[in-house]
Each structure stands twice: as structure tokens, then as C-alpha cells.
Amino acid sequence: MAELYIDADACPVKAEAERVAVRHGARMYLVSNGGIRPPAHPLVESVFVPEGPDAADKWIADRAGTGDVVVTSDIPLAAKAVAAGALVVKPNGETLTTANIGNALATRDLMADLRSADPFRQGGGRPFSRADRSRFLDALERAMRKAAEAARDAGQDEAGT
């Protein structure tokens, strides 16, 4: 069965992800260093990791694999999850795959270099929108179906069928 891992710190789509996970009967892990409400549904588990750089990312990367779905905006975590065979969906609905994760990493690094070169630069990305939320729900639904299929196929392969 597919599992859903949410990089929950500052994730704007936790409630939407929970609804999709429950509908699919999938276990969901909300991974953060605190500050989120415990979920009410038994399929949804809050995982609190120690404060520190990338503790939530490490927890997710150590567990996610083929047949799982990871929701994150963190590109290095997404790269690790993709390498492990997981499907990755960003909160804006963009999917990250082996075909595009290299470009995403390069763009991230370039933008970090540009920001560090201009200390007076202000602003950030555009605000999260209803359209982003809608794209996310569509992408997560497709990813959960694909992950369930991959998990089913992996189970059949292990059973020798």
C-alpha cells in the first residue's frame, strides 16, 4: 500500500493531502519539528523530529521509496525521494521526476547564487493560489493512483507472479 509523506513545516496543503490519503486508505505521515496539530484520523500520524537543519527531510528520505508519495517544496529532499523511487508532488501541483529533478536542482542552486549576490533583493515567490491548490489536488490524486499501482506491482513481483 502506498504511503504518503508530507514535509509539513510551512506546507499549505496538509488538509488537502489528508483528505486524499484517507480516501485512498493510505497511511500519511506529517513530518515536522513541531507546531502542527495532531491529526484526528487514525491513518494520519504526526511525526515530530528534533529541531535542526533538514531533520524532517532526513526522516522522510530514510523511509520513502517505490510505491510512496512525498509532498515537499524542498528540492534536495525531492531529489533523494525520486532517487529512492518515490513519486514527488510540490504543493503547487508540480511533479518532480527523474526527467526533471536535475533541472530543478540546477535552478535552485542558480537562484540561491543570485540571491546571495544581491543582498538588497526583496521579495520571493508568488503567493500560493486557489489554482495552485487545485493543481496540487489533481497531481496528488494521480500520484496516489500511480503509487498504489507500483506498490501492487512490487508485491506481485515479490510473490513471483
Curated annotation (Swiss-Prot):
InterPro entries, sorted: UPF0178
Q: Which family does it belong to?
A: Belongs to the UPF0178 family.
Q: Where are the transmembrane segments?
A: none
What NCBIfam families does UniProt report for this protein, alphabetically? PRK00124.1
What Pfam family is a match, any one? DUF188
Please tell me the species this chain comes from.
Answer: Cereibacter sphaeroides (strain ATCC 17025 / ATH 2.4.3) (Rhodobacter sphaeroides)
The protein, known as: UPF0178 protein Rsph17025_3122
Organism lineage: Bacteria, Pseudomonadati, Pseudomonadota, Alphaproteobacteria, Rhodobacterales
